[in-house]
Amino acid sequence: MSKITNEQVKHVAHLARLEITEEEATKFSAQLEAILNFADQLEEVDTEGVEPTFHVLDLQNVLREDVAETSLTQEEILKNAAHTEDGQFKVPSILGGGE
């Protein structure tokens, strides 16, 4: 496994629109490398003859019944919002430049 560089960590952080320090990049680089090394170890485990497991527990579709309930009106929801426009929340752009 090749080493995860600080530059790679910074690039991923940039794509996620996260600002990280050089110290954090170094820390995350080491953590990511440890995770990938562990994944490599898992790949080496002999699973010949082991049945695939799709569900650890023998439960399927354990969901609550979908029941419609009364909820807040649009006015009630928007009344505490700092900014609204055309009946919707208006928030600052985080992507910038139309990205």
UniProtKB/Swiss-Prot annotation:
Keywords assigned: ATP-binding, Ligase, Nucleotide-binding, Protein biosynthesis
Keyword Magnesium found: no
Pfam short name (any one): GatC
Intrachain disulfide bonds: none
EC top class, as a word: ligase
Assembly mode: Heterotrimer of A, B and C subunits.
Function: Allows the formation of correctly charged Asn-tRNA(Asn) or Gln-tRNA(Gln) through the transamidation of misacylated Asp-tRNA(Asn) or Glu-tRNA(Gln) in organisms which lack either or both of asparaginyl-tRNA or glutaminyl-tRNA synthetases. The reaction takes place in the presence of glutamine and ATP through an activated phospho-Asp-tRNA(Asn) or phospho-Glu-tRNA(Gln).
Alphabetized HAMAP family for the sequence: GatC
Protein name: Aspartyl/glutamyl-tRNA(Asn/Gln) amidotransferase subunit C
Organism of provenance: Macrococcus caseolyticus (strain JCSC5402) (Macrococcoides caseolyticum)
Gene: gatC
